[in-house]
């Protein structure tokens, strides 16, 4: 019985120490996983879809490159 209570208390302490990931970081991680964008030259990868890392929209110019719009 004591071991079960100890296990529950330890589990509660571990879960209380884990901080939730902010939504912006989750979005950044998912965009990076899709191929990412190139913020240093304001171009985005064609595989990223309609979004860039900085949440700017992309205007598709060709299959290989697209310019990010403000």
UniProtKB/Swiss-Prot annotation:
Compartment(s) where it occurs, according to its Swiss-Prot or TrEMBL record: Secreted
KW Signal (keyword) present: yes
Entry-linked Pfam families: Toxin_7
Molecular function per GO: toxin activity
Keywords in alphabetical order: Amidation, Disulfide bond, Knottin, Neurotoxin, Secreted, Signal, Toxin
Tissue specificity statement from the Swiss-Prot or TrEMBL entry: Expressed by the venom gland.
GO annotations of cellular component type: extracellular region
Proregion positions: 21-34
Leucine amide sites (modified residues): 69
Signal peptide positions on this chain: 1-20
Cystine pairs: 37-53, 44-58, 52-68
Family the UniProt entry places it in: Belongs to the neurotoxin 01 (U2-agtx) family.
Domain notes: The presence of a 'disulfide through disulfide knot' structurally defines this protein as a knottin.
Reported function: Insect active toxin causing rapid but reversible paralysis in crickets. No activity shown in mammals. Does not show effect on mammalian voltage-gated calcium channels.
Protein name per Swiss-Prot or TrEMBL: U2-agatoxin-Ao1r
Organism: Agelena orientalis (Funnel-web spider)
């Amino acid at each position: 019985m004591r071991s079960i209570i100890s296990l529950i208390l330890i589990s509660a302490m571990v879960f209380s120490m884990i901080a939730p990931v902010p939504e912006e970081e989750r979005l950044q991680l998912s965009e990076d996983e899709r191929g990412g964008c190139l913020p240093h030259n304001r171009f985005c990868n064609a595989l990223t879809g309609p979004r860039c890392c900085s949440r700017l929209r992309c205007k598709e110019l060709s299959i290989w490159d697209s310019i990010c719009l403000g």
